[in-house]
C-alpha cells in the first residue's frame, strides 16, 4: 500500500497549478517569466492575487491530501511523511511538465498541516513574519522550513528524517535565491 500511495502522491504533486492556471487564463508560463518559478509567489507577480491564491491552495492540497489518505489507511506517521515528500518531489520535478516545477514550499506546508498542524502553524508564522520584515519570499521560505525541525524532533520524531530530507530539497531548490541573497540581488515585493 505504501508504494502505491507514494506513486499516486508523486503523480498528484506533478500537477502544477501555476502552469495549468496560466495556460487556462492565457498568462505566460511561470517557468519562462518573472522569477522562472512555477509557484504562488511568481503567479502573484505575473497573474495577480486571485490566481496566486488559487495556485497556493492547489499546491497546499497536493501536500495535504496524500498525507490524509495515508493516515486514513492506517499508515505510520513516518510513512505518511514519506508519502508527503513524494508529493513535494512531484511538485519539484513534475512528470507532466518535463520535470521543471516549483520550489515546493506550499506543497510542503500542506504536508506539514496533515502530519502535525502545530509545525505547519509555526512555519506559516515564521514565513509571514520574515516576509513582513524583509519583503523577500525566498528568505521567508529558507527560514520557515528548517524552523519546524526542532519541534518535530521533540513532538513527532518519526517525521524528522522525511522532513529533514524535504528541508534539504527545498534549500537546494532555492540555491539560486541563496546566491542572489548573498549578492544583494534577490527580488523583493
Curated annotation (Swiss-Prot):
Subunit-structure text: Probably interacts with PlsX.
Alphabetized UniProt keyword annotations: Cell inner membrane, Cell membrane, Lipid biosynthesis, Lipid metabolism, Membrane, Phospholipid biosynthesis, Phospholipid metabolism, Transferase, Transmembrane, Transmembrane helix
UniProt cross-references to Pfam families, sorted A to Z: G3P_acyltransf
Listed HAMAP family: PlsY
Record organism: Pseudomonas fluorescens (strain Pf0-1)
Name recorded for this polypeptide: Glycerol-3-phosphate acyltransferase
Pathway of action: Lipid metabolism; phospholipid metabolism
Magnesium listed as a keyword: no
Free-text function comment from the UniProt entry: Catalyzes the transfer of an acyl group from acyl-phosphate (acyl-PO(4)) to glycerol-3-phosphate (G3P) to form lysophosphatidic acid (LPA). This enzyme utilizes acyl-phosphate as fatty acyl donor, but not acyl-CoA or acyl-ACP.
GO molecular function: acyl-phosphate glycerol-3-phosphate acyltransferase activity
